[in-house]
Amino acid sequence: MRFVNPLAHRVVGQPEESRLAGSDRVLAVLRSLGNYPRGVGLEQLARDVDVPKSSLHRALAALCRAGFAEHGERGSYRLGLEFVRIAFAYYEQLDRRQVVEPLLDALAARFGETAHYAELDGAEVVYLAKMTPPGRGTQMTSIVGGRNPAHCTGLGKALMAYALPDENAVAAYVEVHGPLARRTEHTRCEAKALAADLAFVRARGYALDDEENEKGINCIAFPLFLDHPSHPTGAVSISALVHRMGLAQIEEAAGEMRSLIEATLGAVTR
């Protein structure tokens, strides 16, 4: 493998701030590409990253040269094989993934629905593992390595409940990160409603997503305390189409889901 010294292309006399801004721009483009597994056009990328097209062209050219992006048919761009290689190297070294994958297999097999494991990263959840039973699981936008706003997912609320322990903490969070994205008409965007949901999690030990992230899909999620008794490491969920498992039905599965988690991983729930 050929390694390129990043200092070799430094322009003499170029201010440090400009170089940093350029690096930030390239990283922003790379992250945006991750939102489009099937590729994305230049116009959409320019809107997402909010940079001039000339700057976007330079960033994409740098990513393509390094193998982190590919220029596909009809002018679209997507993540390249070098990014995939690095992502899988990171993915494989996650011990927690190896711990939770048997649980996801068991949950998907028992309920016949899609199971996820995710961790909190700032105001977002990052999906680190996913299991969809053949011919049965719900088709969703979630992908391993993908992200969603934490406040509108069961996984996110299961984790936020312990990061934001009271109404004041929730209000401060909404002030910093707001206005919170309203994915559907059910999304809890106001501090009071979100705080009530997080209090529910602490009282019941699980979170519900009532079509808050994707219309027609609901979810139940449990925080997992794998590394610390008070701070969840991540969360596991079951997601289903509303017409197949309504919110009441999915909540009825909470006891069995908790038992299955504890039988597989031990006493890691609340």
Language-model features and meaning:
Residues 177-179, 261-270:
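Cysteine/selenocysteine-centered motifs that mediate thiol-based redox chemistry or coordinate metal-sulfur cofactors
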Residues 9, 137-215:
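Short, solvent-exposed recognition segments
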Residues 125-131, 137-141:
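Amphipathic coiled-coil signal-relay and dimerization helices
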Residues 104-112, 116:
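Short regulatory alpha-helical segment in sensory/regulatory domains of signaling proteins that mediates
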Residues 1-97, 262-267:
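N-terminal helix-turn-helix
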Residues 184-262:
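Extended hydrophobic
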Residues 116-118, 126-129, 220-222:
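Conserved hydrophobic/aromatic positions in well-ordered beta-strands
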